[in-house]
Amino acid sequence: MILLPMVANAYDIGVKNEDGVFIYYNYINDGSELEVTYYDLDYNIYKYKGSVVIPEEVTYMNRTRKVTSIGEMAFYYCTGLTSVTIPNSVTSIGKRAFYRCKGLTSVTIPNSVTSIEKFAFMDCSSLTSVTIGNGVTSIGGCAFSDCSSLTSVTIPNSVTSIGDLAFSGCSGLTSVTIPNSVTSIGRCAFYGWKITVVISLIENPYAICGKADEYDRTFNLNTFDDAILYVPAGTIDKYKTTEGWKDFAHIEEGEPTGISVVRNAEGDKAVIYDLNGVRLSEPKRGINIINGKKYVKK
């Protein structure tokens, strides 16, 4: 008798979408709904690639079911995936769902999604734009860690918790907006080297990991020392006495004008940057940031 190797399938059904792309699903919730999954147990025989449009519902064997979840490792290491459309029927994005999808440049997470699990978009190194829907309540640990092309993040006011290392290693990240709804910020959540503006809309600040927490700092030392922390009007004294937040060298009330700036402690000496936050030895033609204020040189 000759034994032939067999592939163990990790899916319940595979159905072509309208673009002719096979998408694989598992039955969930007693078979009433579908979850997007991968093809095989080794995650490597079939790879999603190009543009993938996930449908809101799938009809199979004369029965129609909603697609409500993107399962754990569904698009794991699909480096050829360039775009994905997530429908409004999806409520959760599982662990490592898009881990190391290095060709993915942007993603829109619809308002129907309530949770983004751990490592969901970790190391998507080409990801420059993320739109997080207003239904998301939790962003898991390392969810966007090492997304090195991501430059800014606005977290919607539906989010209550941001996990450990959620945006750590995002070396291109220059600005972060944290809504008042957030009640928990994990260790090293925004540990990125280039953050120049932090906008906190939290009206009653609570302790976060500060400069003394060597391995757990919510932000790195450069951010604490050089970035500007913008806080709601009337709250600056609270921030200056709250653990972690008080470590910011530059705290101002109100919001910036939409420009990313950097300020450091050099007394009255002029500190000059261009609009991209690059430090200049002298003003150049056009708009310059000098000691945190915009000036025009003709």
Q: Over which residues does each language-model region extend?
A:
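A recurrent domain-boundary module in secreted/ectodomain proteins
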Residues: T241-G258
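Bacterial Sec-dependent N-terminal signal peptides
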Residues: M1-D12
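Consensus positions within tandem repeat domains that build extended binding/scaffold surfaces
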Residues: E72-A74, G94-Y99, E117-M122, G140-S145, ...
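C-terminal tail/sorting-segment detector
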Residues: I287-K298
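Residue-level detector of functionally pivotal "anchor" positions at catalytic/ligand-binding pockets or at interdomain
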Residues: G254-N276
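Structural signature of tandem-repeat unit edges
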Residues: N29-L34, Y46-S69, T79-S92, K102-S115, ...
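Short beta-strand/loop segment at the start of cytosolic alpha/beta domains
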Residues: Y11-N44
